[in-house]
């Protein structure tokens, strides 16, 4: 095994990128970046019925959106191609043949019906089913009968153990393992076999994956031993639980879909910040930048306790990044959400940045921000009649007229210049600014709630704001 650090993320393209998969990819990526290693993406596409190009694209798109960039793999190439398991079948067959020739694996001709009967009998007798080794010493090859290839476990007593970077030392007795299936009759490798061959040939030095794979590690270690290969280190990550404290799953939890968060207006910076803390922490730090993640992350700091999905914390982090990232950056990301709501704005339109500055204190997602911005982009306004009756009186409309005329005369609109007009009119009338601002707010938004009045006028744009003020004045 090579001494240089090499880690991998090996998803199956049978659906979208799962939050658990994204965390595994992130941890491996950060570890490689911190310690000068290489991060490999390998596609385990041997489930021929469920693997699809659409799922592969969804996984790659999810990683790209999160900016988890791989060094070797699909679209990149590398020194150990191919990076798709279905393109490596000859390699798996070669090693299976070697193991059979060495007496460390064998062909099993037991039918599914026979195995089903034995499994039912074991259940009836209250014992755990283990393959009894029926074909272990079989020499004949029944004509026309399909077979699988099984690993031949040692017959003597013994145990297999490993030191997990997260869980510590774990041991299992040989007697708890049976002769597991390595390869199907059609030459497709099963998980425990294929990943060992690939991890060794791709010189992987550390395998990080979810705790649900702990039990898979023992047969894999036996295979490493049979092949005379040095196994990598292992780090098994804690489970992620949904808000209901059940294991986060594609079937039960919509939160499991990485790209759904993008569609809902969550920023990738916020999602990464949230996900890294599902099992890892750095003191009491809540907000962690990408550079800090790279500088701080280590598997020795990963806990064994399950992380629980907290939607409020994700929204809190998202609003933090909406407030602190450059407004021009957020403006570019806001544009697609406005377009989806029927209000496309060209790239660089100054209103985009105005919306960000005015709305980011209240909006928790890009989608919320876009929803708040829509009234400023619509033609015309629907007045709340109660608000209009209270604030658009004959006396208040006189103040509205003054604001309208003085604002129209401004050579350039800005928050400062518009606030100055409101202040001047209120001082001249001897009333508080609210007595002037609130009628203006109702006239242009239809209700009594909005950002600051200068910001609100600026967001509306000069032409539309004046049209709405004129419409309100026409009521009087």
PLM features per residue range, with description:
Residues 2-124, 215-229:
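N-terminal Rossmann-like or analogous alpha/beta NTP/dinucleotide-binding catalytic cores
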Residues 8-13, 41-45, 202-207, 256, ...:
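Glycine- and acidic
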Residues 23-26, 269, 434:
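Short, acidic loop-beta-alpha module within alpha/beta folds
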Residues 28, 59, 99, 103, ...:
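Residue-level signal for inorganic ion chemistry
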Residues 48, 215, 227-383, 390, ...:
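Catalytic adenosine-cofactor/nucleotide-binding cores of aminoacyl-tRNA synthetases and other
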Residues 93-98, 102-104, 136, 270, ...:
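Residue patterns forming the tRNA-binding/recognition surfaces of aminoacyl-tRNA synthetases
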Residues 106-236, 241-248, 257, 261, ...:
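Active-site cores that bind ATP or allylic diphosphates and position pyrophosphate for catalysis
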Residues 331, 388-446:
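C-terminal accessory/binding modules appended to enzymatic or scaffolding proteins
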């Amino acid at each position: 095994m090579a001494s240089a650090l090499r880690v991998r993320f090996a998803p199956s393209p049978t659906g979208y990128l799962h939050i658990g998969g994204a965390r595994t990819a992130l941890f491996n990526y950060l570890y490689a970046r911190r310690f000068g290693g290489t991060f490999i993406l390998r596609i385990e596409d041997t489930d021929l019925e469920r693997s699809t190009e659409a799922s592969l694209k969804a996984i790659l798109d999810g990683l790209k959106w999160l900016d988890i960039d791989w060094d070797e793999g699909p679209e990149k190439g590398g020194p150990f191609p191919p990076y798709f398991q279905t393109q490596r079948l000859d390699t798996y067959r070669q090693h299976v043949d070697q193991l059979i020739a060495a007496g460390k694996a064998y062909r099993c001709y037991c039918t599914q019906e026979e195995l089903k009967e034995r499994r039912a009998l074991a259940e009836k007798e209250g014992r755990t089913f283990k393959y009894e080794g029926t074909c272990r010493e079989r020499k004949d090859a029944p004509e026309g009968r399909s077979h699988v290839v099984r690993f031949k476990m040692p017959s003597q007593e013994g145990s297999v153990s490993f030191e997990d970077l997260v869980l510590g030392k774990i041991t299992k007795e040989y007697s708890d393992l049976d002769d597991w299936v390595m390869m199907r009759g059609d030459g497709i490798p099963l998980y425990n076999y294929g990943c060992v061959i690939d991890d060794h040939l791709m010189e992987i030095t550390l395998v990080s994956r979810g705790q649900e794979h702990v039990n898979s590690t023992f047969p894999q270690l036996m295979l490493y031993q049979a092949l005379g290969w040095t196994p990598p280190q292992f780090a098994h990550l804690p489970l992620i639980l949904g808000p209901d404290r059940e294991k986060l799953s594609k079937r039960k939890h919509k939160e499991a879909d990485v790209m759904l968060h993008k569609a809902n207006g969550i920023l990738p910076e916020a999602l990464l910040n949230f996900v890294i803390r599902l099992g890892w922490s750095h003191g009491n730090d809540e907000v962690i930048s990408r550079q800090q993640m790279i500088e701080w992350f280590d598997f020795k700091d990963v806990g064994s306790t399950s992380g629980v999905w907290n939607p409020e914390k994700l929204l809190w982090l998202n609003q933090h990044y909406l407030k602190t990232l450059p407004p021009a950056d957020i403006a570019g990301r806001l544009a697609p959400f406005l377009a989806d709501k029927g209000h496309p704005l060209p790239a660089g339109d100054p209103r985009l940045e105005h919306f960000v500055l005015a709305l980011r204190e209240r909006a928790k997602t890009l989608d919320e921000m876009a929803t708040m911005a829509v009234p400023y982009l619509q033609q015309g306004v629907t007045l709340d009649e109660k608000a209009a009756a209270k604030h658009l009186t004959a006396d208040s409309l006189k103040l509205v007229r003054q604001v309208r005329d003085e604002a129209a005369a401004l050579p350039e609109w800005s928050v400062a210049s518009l606030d100055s007009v409101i202040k001047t009119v209120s001082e001249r009338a001897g009333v508080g600014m609210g007595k002037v601002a609130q009628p203006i707010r109702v006239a242009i938004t239809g209700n009594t709630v909005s950002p600051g009045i200068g910001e609100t006028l600026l967001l509306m744009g000069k032409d539309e704001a004046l049209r709405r003020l004129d419409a309100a004045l026409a009521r009087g």
